[in-house]
């Protein structure tokens, strides 16, 4: 715009700020700027009230803001720096660096509100993204350019699994990653940053060689920031996809907080709540974000999203709305974590669209279904075992139970990022070895080995070595 229109603050209620303009009103989603305690405060237009007033959502704290303060219309939506200048850096929702490493320098900017790619631009090929984590690669494989949801209640290991995926894929992957911390713990964000420095994902001495950009809007931020920080992260990922033409990884921890912040904003704007108190625009908000995460002819964005499940209820509107957009779901189960099996992935609840013989091949598909079949048989026998004991089972069922218990333990795996908890080095297992190992267990080739040998190891060779160690200790 040639001349920036000026307005003034007329009302401040928490994160909602009303601004009066005597000239024309700025369009919905435009960014307005004012000064608060000597710092730039960005407001996003959410509603038009009458002929001269707009209702806006603040992207930072409004303490100290006064009525009558001057507000400037920037003439465009919130725009953030993108490209190589952001690598190795931590940005906030409006693209300001918050890692005390100085300015970003010359960087091109991009608006955080973008249309989703058109049908003509989208790519439709399916290819497996190997993570090195056995239970995921075998039973619910991730697709390149797909959307993956990590579902779980509080404290079952969503963030640890995301950190392991970043660790594994950054080591073997030449592409870029973007991590959006949406409404999660600042301490975890800090830990993640320092672990990335230690593992070499962020090169602190030469930031331009780093492989990841971080965008944080944590729990202590106002709802406006938490509702927009996922879009800021996605905008960075879109730029990397378009400029490099490679597979970009986009991690969101936690997508539920995006919905939660949207609910807070909706209530502040006076909208009538929908089911369970969520915003009436829940599906629209989620769709606007998720439809932008896709593969185009230029490259792809593979998204891994941690999804907190309130009270472990998968039918809650927030996780239920996320389900519709996902290609693969990794469900983390409290019952499995209580057995000490980590990652606590539920092998029967977790699903993947690409677990199809035409995509992963006949052998992989058949082994995965055989593993699930044995585990399902064990699950259906558990009531009988609890009431009558193992002795009442047929010989065939006893064998199924023994194999299922070995498979259950074999699906556990030590992680690099969890070394501080377990004391053992993490392992990444190639897909071919995962398939071959489970095929042998299903076929009964290792029925003679003890259950304990299958716990927290890599492939079948590690099981044999552990069994020999256990036998030597017992002797």
Swiss-Prot record:
Keywords noted in UniProt: ATP synthesis, ATP-binding, Cell inner membrane, Cell membrane, CF(1), Hydrogen ion transport, Ion transport, Membrane, Nucleotide-binding, Translocase, Transport
Locations listed in the record: Cell inner membrane
Pfam families reported for this sequence: ATP-synt_ab, ATP-synt_ab_N, ATP-synt_VA_C
Residues bound to ATP: 152-159
Known EC number: 7.1.2.2
A GO molecular-function descriptor: ATP hydrolysis activity
A GO CC term attached to the entry: plasma membrane
Statement: the UniProt record of this protein carries the keyword Chloroplast: no
Catalytic activity: ATP + H2O + 4 H(+)(in) = ADP + phosphate + 5 H(+)(out)
Role this protein plays: Produces ATP from ADP in the presence of a proton gradient across the membrane. The catalytic sites are hosted primarily by the beta subunits.
Annotated family: Belongs to the ATPase alpha/beta chains family.
HAMAP family the UniProt entry points to: ATP_synth_beta_bact
Official protein name in the record: ATP synthase subunit beta 1
The organism of origin for this protein: Cereibacter sphaeroides (strain ATCC 17023 / DSM 158 / JCM 6121 / CCUG 31486 / LMG 2827 / NBRC 12203 / NCIMB 8253 / ATH 2.4.1.)
């Amino acid at each position: 715009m040639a001349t920036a229109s000026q307005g003034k603050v007329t009302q401040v209620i928490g994160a909602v700020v009303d601004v009066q303009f005597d000239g024309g009103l700025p369009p919905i989603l435009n960014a307005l700027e004012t000064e608060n305690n000597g710092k730039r405060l960005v407001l996003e237009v959410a509603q038009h009230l009458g002929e001269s007033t707009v209702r806006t959502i603040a992207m930072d704290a409004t303490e100290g803001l006064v009525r009558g303060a001057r507000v400037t219309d920037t003439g465009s939506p919130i725009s953030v720096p993108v490209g190589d200048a952001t690598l190795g850096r931590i940005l906030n929702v409006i693209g300001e660096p918050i890692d005390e490493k100085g300015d970003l320098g010359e960087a091109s900017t991009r608006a955080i509100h973008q249309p989703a790619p058109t049908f003509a631009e989208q790519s439709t090929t399916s290819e497996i993204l190997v993570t090195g984590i056995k239970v995921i690669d075998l039973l619910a494989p991730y697709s390149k350019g797909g959307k993956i949801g990590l579902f779980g209640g509080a404290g079952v290991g969503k963030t640890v699994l995301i950190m392991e995926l970043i660790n594994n894929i950054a080591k073997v992957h030449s592409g870029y990653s973007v991590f959006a911390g949406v409404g999660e713990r600042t301490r975890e964000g800090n830990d993640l940053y320092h672990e990335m420095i230690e593992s070499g994902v962020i090169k602190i001495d030469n930031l331009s060689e780093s492989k990841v950009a971080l965008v944080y809007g944590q729990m202590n931020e106002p709802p406006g920031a938490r509702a927009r920080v996922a879009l800021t992260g996605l905008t960075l990922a879109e730029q990397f996809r378009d400029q490099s033409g490679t597979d970009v990884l986009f991690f969101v921890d936690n997508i539920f907080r995006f919905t939660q912040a949207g609910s807070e904003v909706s209530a502040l704007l006076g909208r009538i709540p929908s089911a369970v108190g969520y915003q009436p625009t829940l599906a629209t908000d989620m769709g606007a974000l998720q439809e932008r995460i896709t593969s185009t002819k230029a490259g792809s964005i593979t998204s891994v999203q941690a999804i907190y499940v309130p009270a472990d209820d998968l039918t809650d509107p927030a996780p239920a709305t996320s389900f519709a957009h996902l290609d693969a779901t990794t469900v983390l189960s409290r019952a499995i974590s209580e057995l000490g099996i980590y990652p606590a992935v539920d092998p029967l609840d977790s699903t993947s669209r690409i677990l199809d013989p035409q995509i992963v091949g006949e052998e992989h598909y058949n082994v995965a279904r055989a593993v699930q079949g044995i585990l399902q048989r064990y699950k259906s026998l558990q009531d009988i075992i609890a009431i009558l004991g193992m002795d009442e089972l047929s010989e065939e069922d006893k064998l199924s139970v023994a194999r299922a218990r070995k498979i259950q333990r074999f699906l556990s795996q030590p992680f690099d990022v969890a070394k501080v908890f377990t004391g053992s080095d993490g392992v990444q297992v190639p897909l071919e070895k995962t398939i071959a190992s489970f095929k042998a267990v299903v076929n009964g080739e290792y029925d003679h080995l003890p259950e304990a040998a299958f716990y927290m190891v890599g492939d079948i060779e590690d099981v044999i070595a552990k069994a020999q160690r256990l036998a030597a200790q017992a002797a």
